[in-house]
UniProtKB/Swiss-Prot annotation:
The gene is rlmN. This is Dual-specificity RNA methyltransferase RlmN. Its cofactor is [4Fe-4S] cluster. Reaction proceeds by a ping-pong mechanism involving intermediate methylation of a conserved cysteine residue. Its EC number is 2.1.1.192. It comes from Sulfurimonas denitrificans (strain ATCC 33889 / DSM 1251). Keywords: 4Fe-4S, Cytoplasm, Disulfide bond, Iron, Iron-sulfur, Metal-binding, Methyltransferase, rRNA processing, S-adenosyl-L-methionine, Transferase, tRNA processing. One of its GO terms (cellular component) is cytoplasm. Residues 106-339 form the Radical SAM core domain.
Amino acid sequence: MKPSLLDFRLKELQANIKPSFRAKQIYGWLYHNYAQSFDDMKNIPQQLKDELAKSYVVNLLKIVKKELSNDGTIKYLFELQDGKTIETVWLKMKDEQIDEEGCVTQEAKYTICVSTQVGCKVGCAFCLTAKGGFTRDLTAGEIVAQVVALKKDNDHKHNRMINIVYMGMGEPLDNLDNLSRAIEIFKEEDGLCISGKRQTVSTSGLSNKIDRLGEMDLGVHIAISLHAVDDELRTELIPMNKAHNISSIIEAVKRFPIDTRKRVMFEYLVIKNKNDDLGSAKKLVKLLSGIKAKVNLIYFNPYPDTPYERPQKSDMIAFQEYLINHGLLCTIRDSKGIDISAACGQLKEKTQSELQ
């Protein structure tokens, strides 16, 4: 496959495209106008476009299917150049605010949930993506292309703020080289200009890779998919815990460079009769003592044939209240897109079933 122009930072394109100002124009077409082909680049000489087309492609993704939730969540299934498919989610976090005179006082806020791999190696017991196994890493361009495609499809101007969470298909830190390149591309001032502070890397806990990410000093946030407070249950839910146990993860988090004004996010997927009891809440308080942490409780999002169940709302609230009363900042994540195939891997699985 040819590489995409989305695989490169501006300085790299400038080194390969002469005169260099043309590279900057092309960068504008990619990230300000969301060009899908060389033909879209109206002020670029045809000879240069023909030359570039011999070595590069522009668009890497084809929308196979998308589903719109009542809450504004949009789930996308994309086909890659090699025919593999990935999922990306457009999340509406806050509605637009309008005053009595009809003036916008606050723009709507959006987050894009991005995939980093086709499939996943981690094999979490509760995750539908894990059923399909691992196929390959995404390139940096394929990671970047998801954000470009969603901003284009939702008419979201390049200079409007957006947050990125690497919480889609795959383990981000298992594809760290391509992930870090994508992060740097997003940060480009002449591109989308999405700072590290607006990018969150979610990991199931590759403790050695947490250290390496910290050494890269990319300025991103991390979120730890903890989901259990003892190694026995966590190994059941996340088999990789045998190699990267809870203790090693906590120590890696303590070493990670964190903005003193920020907190480390710990994600805790709550599953009925597994980890929703107050005994688990008590252990969680002890586990996170000494860490400037925020706990995000997440309702398990059921899918067909899963043995796990969604917890009761009353149990979620009791769990949250216990953590708050014992000094932890704790939120319950709104269940986005519950009326559509919003759990990771669901839309892909559903579409494949329909085609059979």
